[in-house]
Design a protein with these regions (language model features):
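Active-site neighborhoods and metal-handling regions in enzymes and metal-associated proteins
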Residues: 1-170
Length: 170
């Protein structure tokens, strides 16, 4: 970069501090934008929960979610992940037909004009209710999440929170 080999480049402490300040501290206007992105993202997921039913295709649910983003003058934060085959990470194929008993994984978000974006994941039972086994797994995952959130605070290494979550699982 600029003809300087990477091994000879030095970091600029003032520049690094300026970037950190921009990322860590938000104005009231920025907070409003962040909240709008999160609100529209939540509405996208709630819409999916309302419309999902056996017999639909994944792309029909995605279209309804996209409509929510677009009707709020938002773009998608990223390509929506919305498969019944959630075991395949980052699956962007939306052509499967939803069957009774399926779980529908959603990872989607809305981006407002200012560039702030939401990113949320949900797992929704196609039949509106979890089976007994699905509920058991959901409750384990939820306990892992809640314990991890309680443990998060400045200075706590990520690995400590990860290990706490793993202990809750087992």
């Amino acid at each position: 970069w600029l003809g300087i080999p990477p091994a000879r480049q030095e970091g600029s402490v003032p520049f690094i501090r300026a970037v950190i300040a921009q990322r860590n501290y938000k104005s009231a206007e920025e907070i409003v934008e962040i909240e709008k992105a999160c609100d529209v993202t939540a509405d996208m997921h709630i819409t999916a929960m309302k419309v999902l039913r056996p017999g639909m295709y994944e792309y029909e649910v995605v279209a309804e979610m996209n409509r929510v983003a677009e009707s709020n003058n938002c773009q998608l934060s990223f390509a929506t992940i919305a498969p019944i085959n959630g075991q395949t990470l980052h699956n962007h194929y939306h052509g499967n037909k939803v069957k009774p008993g399926d779980l529908f994984l959603i990872d989607a978000g809305a981006e407002v004009e200012s560039g702030y974006a939401g990113d949320m994941s949900s797992t929704i039972p196609a039949d509106k209710k979890f089976t007994t086994r699905q509920r058991e797994v959901y409750e384990i995952q939820n306990a892992m999440h809640l314990e991890s959130v309680k443990a998060l605070r400045p200075g706590i290494p990520y690995m400590d929170v990860y290990e706490l979550s793993a202990r809750v699982m087992v």
